Amino acid sequence: MAGVGCHFLLSLSPPLYSIRRPAAAHRPAKARSHISCCSRHDDAEACSTSKPLTNGKEEEKTTPSRRKCLACLCAVTLISASGPTMLTPNGLASDMMSKPAVCRNCNGSGAVLCDMCGGTGKWKALNRKRAKDVYLFTECPNCYGRGKLVCPVCLGTGLPNNKGLLRRPDAKKLLDKMYNGKILPDS
């Protein structure tokens, strides 16, 4: 980044005199900015030795467009903002390699919140009698009041890969217990 530079010079322009508007002679001098962009090493040396121009005609010839100024400022900002992130030796992925792999659905706990009651264990049932409706809180029929269910992805193990678990002969009994609510999470 030795050859990239952006110089900003501020110069006062002479006051505007006009024959048609006599009030223009009493206006203060306007400040004009001069921005020059140097993208190569040769240009950077020329930019560092350049002096602000005082003649209005010469300044108009050398003033870059607004689009070029904006492109230069954006490029310098992006280069300076992205610099430190490229030099970081340890990223987020290197931290994840040291941790053991866990199930993505339950984060390794083996249990998930019940989707019917939201983990409260209570289920809102509607009791309709003639003109008014009454809500009754009963035990959740999905989790049987516990608020948690066994994770259906890892089957309560907390591991992301349990391919051989369902091939075992006792796996059918395990699944039946899990779906009927007889197997408890964390057991």
Curated annotation (Swiss-Prot):
Top-level lineage group: Eukaryota
InterPro entries with a match to the protein in the record: HSP_DnaJ_Cys-rich_dom_sf
Keywords: Chloroplast, Metal-binding, Plastid, Repeat, Thylakoid, Transit peptide, Zinc, Zinc-finger
Localization in the cell: Plastid, Chloroplast thylakoid lumen
GO MF annotations, alphabetized: protein-disulfide reductase [NAD(P)H] activity; zinc ion binding
Coiled coil: none
Chain intervals annotated as zinc finger (CR-type): 90-163
A GO BP annotation: photosystem I assembly
UniProt main location, coarse: plastid
GO cellular component terms, A-Z: chloroplast; chloroplast thylakoid lumen; thylakoid lumen
Transit peptide stretch: 1-94
Stretches forming CXXCXGXG motif repeats: 103-110, 114-121, 140-147, 151-158
Function: Nuclear genome-encoded factor required for the accumulation of photosystem I (PSI) during plant development.
Name of protein: Protein PHOTOSYSTEM I ASSEMBLY 2, chloroplastic
Protein's gene: PSA2
